[in-house]
């Protein structure tokens, strides 16, 4: 066992490694741990092989578990938004959490962040830790201004919520109550089933719940309510009565809605139980219907508005054509549930009766079949669109039994033949309204770099994901700590290559500061310690936006100077009485620093160098302290000297107390007496002889350099928790030889301060003070826009596959980094274009805010079609999904063109407003919907002639000439663009 009764480090490492592999089980409790603390713990216990050299090193001791980085300020349980598993936090089962707390305790004032495991999915069940709880606003019917916020798990029941509300508002147990959902415009819906979970009930983030108490005369303040279905009852908490009397009580209620100027109760049909218009607004323009935000569901609202304003798809659902094609038996589908739910929603939105609807039932259905969308976290609009298009396709697939098809390579055959074959094969398994409207065909060409094997395939697509020209640079904020100890750190903003290394950062900082790049050391400081000390060749991608990057000036040549060593130094405050079960009796404070010192040094010289390095914020009293004696420290003579830290290296306490007066030394400052704190040459001022840092009589005997007291003691740490014997025996790292202290690159130094001395002499405000360089105010110049066609050209540019995504060459029988080229063969009636604005890496997430200039009308795609029979292929924009904000979060809206009046509108959740074309092109544009011009004929026209299906899209040969189709506008199509009809 380790110190304080904690398990030894090998046991800790083994236990936690095993518990991290624990399977999730519904109902279990797991705990969040800040990933930065956990990484520090991994270093301390040597969890990973590359951290073994730091195992047991007190300089990387993690201290109490600190989850403050996960929490919003001032709230012990409210998590910051958009935290990501493993990047921001680690999940531990209860046993693992309890072990860590027993070994390290939890930071004072913090509470455990416990979360339940919930089950998600309808057919394919899987468990997930519910990191973000659902925040509900609770109030009483008689006083809705007094709102209390509480957080619940999606696994909690309505009964659990009701009990909590009763407790909050001190409602007696015998008092009969019932619960209501309160929506916008004072619209209410009763919660009927006490055993329903929050997830089943579809309660969303920020939902207002109202508890209503029954009047003394037996009536309800809100009046009676209508059950959803025969036999259903409103959720009420009643005194103990028989089931029969309970049934009679509700059966005697009037089946009517109660409405007044303040509220209305809805009728309970499929959507009407929660979809409302504002009172008095029942004659809306069809399609101009907003969607209520259920809590971070703007991504869904934006996607739905774009699909809703896709004329051929909406006409298909409004005309009930979907009912004939529902596929309930498709194993890849959702038993028709997604299609039916979407159809009901579209009918509500286009009924002209509502100014907005609440898509709660649709959201619930999506979450059942796609658990990643079941919560109320911000999601990607394009990812939801991909799911909806695929889900609708499978629910409406006209193919009831999919045949097995052997895919063939081109093997030198003409593109026209291979394309026709590929499209026919696709239609044998996939034939739906989604295929009719959204599917196109592209050509993929792979070339092996070894044997020159060429592989050509034709593959269908539902949308185009277009890359944007990547930003080649990023800005980083760093703090430069100069050698001059009197100079405050300075904050800089540097522009560095996005795919660069630490040397690039130093070079950029050198241009601003004048300090040579080779005289810089870049570090990441976290929780008062060095989290990382970077090598010059490390990638900048490992630096995240939230990291505190400090760059230290070191005036030595690290490759040639053999006389000096760079030592990391951290500051610790001693505890007089530690209540921690496993702690060294100290806690870190202040900012650590790096300094270069001679390899051969005396303890006294090192102490003096350290004191001078901190002279800006360590204030020495100028009053003589007769009772303690004095140690004189020259205020200025050792600053800006010839040493690697801007100070002289020759001074020692005895040398500095010279009898030869000068103008500088006459300003001597006094330190307290050292007689109580002198160090033996073996202990180096360590903790081994006295827990409070004071030497015993034996260790101090014969080692006094005068009646002087030091402000701090210091302790060296290397591969482990260094003790006296280790220092004496292991001459590879630290040793004494004729009272000389030997150091090397593996040495770490901790300065231990007595709390009283720290309070008296250490100025924390001065230590944390810094200045700002003018570069901090730098704003990058406006980036020039790119055209949509530039993105399409980039999409069709030849590229080399990455090492992590090779292609298996059938000739070489090996995976190769082949060259790949994509080309467009045929395009669908509605072209969905996804602008790839978000980029991901192991350490960084980023959003590209490049302005893409896309045409509203007359997007000519003909030049990008390699089909030799392709003719004119022009598109008009019909909808745009917008994303405002950064990578971690933001807001989605939509622009869409109404199919009935041909005007543009702006959809922002429940709000709908008119828009002009000059508003549409912006940096926020994320997903574009284009409809081909030859599919417009009147209002929402789209031909669905089942007789014309075949390989025409693949071949590019029109089924009939324009002259043949003059008699029937419904047959006009440019088959060179269209793939099936």
Swiss-Prot record:
Q: Which domain of life is it from?
A: Eukaryota
- What class does this enzyme belong to in the EC scheme? hydrolase
Where do the USP domain residues begin and end?
Answer: 289-933
One GO cellular-component annotation of the UniProt record comes to: nucleus
Looking at the record, which segments are called Mediates interaction with SART3? 2-223
| UniProt-listed Pfam families | DUSP (PF06337), Ubiquitin_3 (PF14836), UCH (PF00443), USP7_C2 (PF14533)
Chain segments carrying region Disordered: 216-237, 629-694, 952-981
According to UniProt, the name of this protein is Ubiquitin carboxyl-terminal hydrolase 15
Q: What family name appears in the similarity comment? A: Belongs to the peptidase C19 family.
Q: Principal place where this protein is found? A: cytoplasm
Q: What is its EC number?
A: 3.4.19.12
Q: Does the keyword Iron apply?
A: no
> What the protein does?
Hydrolase that removes conjugated ubiquitin from target proteins and regulates various pathways such as the TGF-beta receptor signaling, NF-kappa-B and RNF41/NRDP1-PRKN pathways. Acts as a key regulator of TGF-beta receptor signaling pathway, but the precise mechanism is still unclear: according to a report, acts by promoting deubiquitination of monoubiquitinated R-SMADs (SMAD1, SMAD2 and/or SMAD3), thereby alleviating inhibition of R-SMADs and promoting activation of TGF-beta target genes.
Catalytically driven reaction(s)? Thiol-dependent hydrolysis of ester, thioester, amide, peptide and isopeptide bonds formed by the C-terminal Gly of ubiquitin (a 76-residue protein attached to proteins as an intracellular targeting signal)
Where are stretches of biased composition, namely Acidic residues?
A: 656-673, 960-974
């Amino acid at each position: 066992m380790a110190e304080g009764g904690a398990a030894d480090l090998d046991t800790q490492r083994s236990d936690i490694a095993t518990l991290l592999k624990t399977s999730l089980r519904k109902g279990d409790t797991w705990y969040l741990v800040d990933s930065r603390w956990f990484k520090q713990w991994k270093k301390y216990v040597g969890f990973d092989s590359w951290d073994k050299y730091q195992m047991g090193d007190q300089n990387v001791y993690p201290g109490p578990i600190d989850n403050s980085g996960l929490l919003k300020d001032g709230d012990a349980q409210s998590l910051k938004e958009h935290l990501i598993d493993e990047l921001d936090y680690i999940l531990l089962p209860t046993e693992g959490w309890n072990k860590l707390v027993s070994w390290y305790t939890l930071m004072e004032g913090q509470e455990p962040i416990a979360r339940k495991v919930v089950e998600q999915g309808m057919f394919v069940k899987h468990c997930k830790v519910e990191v973000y709880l659902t925040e509900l606003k609770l109030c009483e019917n008689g006083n809705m201004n007094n709102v209390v916020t509480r957080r619940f798990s999606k696994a909690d029941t309505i009964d659990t919520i009701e009990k909590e509300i009763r407790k909050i508002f001190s409602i007696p147990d015998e008092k009969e109550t019932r619960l209501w959902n309160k929506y916008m415009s004072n619209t209410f819906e009763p919660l009927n089933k006490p055993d329903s979970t929050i997830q089943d009930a579809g309660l969303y983030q920020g939902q207002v719940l109202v508890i209503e108490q029954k009047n003394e005369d037996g009536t309800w303040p809100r009046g009676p309510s209508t059950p959803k279905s025969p036999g259903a009852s409103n959720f009420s908490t009643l005194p103990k009565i028989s089931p029969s009397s309970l049934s009679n009580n509700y059966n005697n209620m009037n089946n009517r809605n109660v409405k007044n100027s303040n509220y209305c109760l809805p009728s309970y049909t499929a959507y009407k139980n929660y979809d409302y218009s504002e009172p008095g607004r029942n004659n809306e323009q069809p399609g101009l219907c907003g969607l209520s935000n259920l809590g971070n569901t703007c991504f869904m609202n934006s996607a739905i508005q774009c699909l809703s304003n896709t004329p051929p798809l909406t006409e298909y659902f409004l005309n009930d054509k979907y009912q004939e094609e529902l596929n309930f038996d498709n194993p890849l589908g959702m038993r028709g549930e997604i299609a039916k739910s979407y159809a009901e929603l579209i009918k509500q939105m286009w009924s002209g009766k509502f100014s907005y609807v609440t898509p709660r039932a649709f959201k619930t259905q999506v979450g059942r079949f796609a658990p990643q969308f079941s919560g109320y976290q911000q999601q990607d609009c394009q990812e939801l669109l991909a799911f909806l298009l695929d889900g609708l396709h499978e629910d409406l697939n006209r193919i009831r039994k999919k045949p097995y098809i052997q895919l063939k390579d081109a093997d030198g055959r003409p593109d026209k033949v291979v394309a026709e074959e590929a499209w026919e094969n696709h239609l044998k398994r996939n034939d739906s309204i989604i295929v009719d409207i959204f599917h196109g065909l592209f050509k993929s060409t792979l070339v092996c770099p070894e044997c020159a094997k060429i592989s050509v395939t034709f593959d269908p697509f539902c949308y185009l994901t277009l890359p944007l020209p990547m930003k080649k640079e990023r800005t980083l904020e760093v703090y430069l700590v100069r050698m001059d100890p009197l100079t405050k750190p300075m904050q800089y903003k540097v522009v560095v290559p996005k795919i660069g290394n630490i040397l690039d950062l130093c070079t950029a900082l050198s241009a601003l500061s004048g300090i040579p790049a080779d005289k810089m050391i870049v570090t990441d400081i976290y929780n008062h310690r060095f989290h990382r000390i970077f090598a010059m060749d490390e990638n900048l991608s490992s630096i995240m936006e939230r990291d505190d990057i400090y760059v230290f000036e070191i005036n030595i040549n690290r490759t040639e100077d053999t006389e000096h060593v760079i030592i990391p130094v951290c500051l610790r405050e001693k505890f007089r009485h530690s209540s921690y079960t496993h702690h060294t009796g100290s806690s870190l404070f202040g900012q650590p620093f790096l300094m270069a010192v001679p390899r051969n040094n005396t303890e006294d010289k090192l102490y003096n160098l350290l004191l001078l390095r901190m002279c800006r914020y360590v204030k020495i009293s100028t009053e003589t302290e007769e009772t303690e004696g004095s140690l004189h420290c020259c205020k200025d003579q050792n600053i800006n000297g010839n040493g690697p830290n801007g100070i002289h290296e020759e001074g020692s306490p005895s040398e500095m107390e010279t009898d030869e007066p000068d103008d500088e030394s006459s300003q001597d400052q006094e330190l307290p007496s050292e007689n109580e704190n002198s160090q033996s040459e073996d202990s180096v001022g360590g903790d081994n002889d006295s827990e409070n840092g004071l030497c015993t009589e034996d260790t101090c005997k014969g080692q006094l350099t005068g009646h002087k007291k030091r402000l701090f003691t210091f302790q060296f740490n290397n591969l482990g928790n260094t003790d006296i014997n280790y220092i004496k025996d292991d001459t590879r790292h630290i040793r004494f030889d004729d009272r000389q202290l030997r150091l090397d690159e593996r040495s770490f130094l901790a300065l231990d301060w007595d709390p009283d001395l720290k309070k008296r002499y250490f100025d924390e405000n001065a230590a944390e003070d810094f200045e700002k360089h003018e570069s901090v105010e730098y704003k990058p110049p406006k980036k020039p826009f790119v055209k949509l066609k530039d993105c399409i050209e980039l999409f069709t540019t030849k590229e080399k596959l990455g090492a992590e995504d090779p292609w298996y060459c059938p000739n070489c029988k090996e995976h190769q980094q082949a060259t790949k080229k994509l080309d467009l063969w045929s395009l669908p009636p509605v072209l969905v274009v996804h602008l790839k604005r978000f980029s991901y890496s192991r350490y960084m997430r980023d959003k590209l805010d490049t302005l893409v200039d896309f045409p509203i009308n007359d997007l000519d795609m003909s030049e990008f079609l390699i089909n030799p029979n392709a003719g004119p292929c022009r598109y008009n924009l019909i909808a745009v999904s917008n994303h405002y904000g950064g990578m971690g979060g933001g807001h989605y809206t939509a622009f869409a063109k109404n199919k009935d009046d041909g005007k543009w509108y702006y959809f922002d959740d429940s709000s709908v407003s008119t828009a002009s074309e000059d508003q549409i092109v912006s940096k926020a544009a994320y997903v574009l919907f284009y409809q081909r011009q030859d599919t417009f004929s009147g209002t929402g026209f789209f031909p669905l002639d089942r007789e014309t299906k075949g390989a025409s899209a693949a071949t590019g040969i029109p089924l009939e000439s324009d002259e043949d189709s003059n008699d029937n506008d419904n047959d006009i199509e440019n088959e060179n663009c269209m793939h099936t009809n």
